[in-house]
């Protein structure tokens, strides 16, 4: 790691986010507080976080990590994965986009580390163009979630908690996972104005019921 990248990581984690201060929660809407009550944290579990963005800020899996859980963090932003590699070296961290097929996709963001980065053109218009926000476009590689899992040490392992937050690409992420193999017990997903019906129908078809609702986030539980 070069010295400039190391400085940016330290500045972000210790000066901006104050990593050294342990918190009761890290999520933006209280998702992790609900999960902490719902999940048996005495048992070590396996999570997958797609659109992980930051290991501390607005993060739904940091509390799980602190309680011995381990998993996979995925983000299309390179700096996001630099942060995860620094803070969570025991996780597997992948700098890649997730879609319903392996392909090259256009990725839009306004700055180096943007929580609103998106590959969805409807979201781009709503959150960037209509608000006169400047953005940059670049072409990046996308794989299916199945492909990432198959090439990880968790191949074939049931997912205890799946978190998806990819600004309008959430439905494509869901479709990229084999639910007969990985069978997530709990799913947290943002449902905004894009693909709401498709997401709800998909989860209902796969026997999930909604058990918690925030401003944008929704948590679903697998019905046995």
Please give the residue ranges for each predicted region:
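Phosphate/nucleotide-binding beta-alpha loop and adjacent structural elements of enzyme active sites
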Residues: 1-224
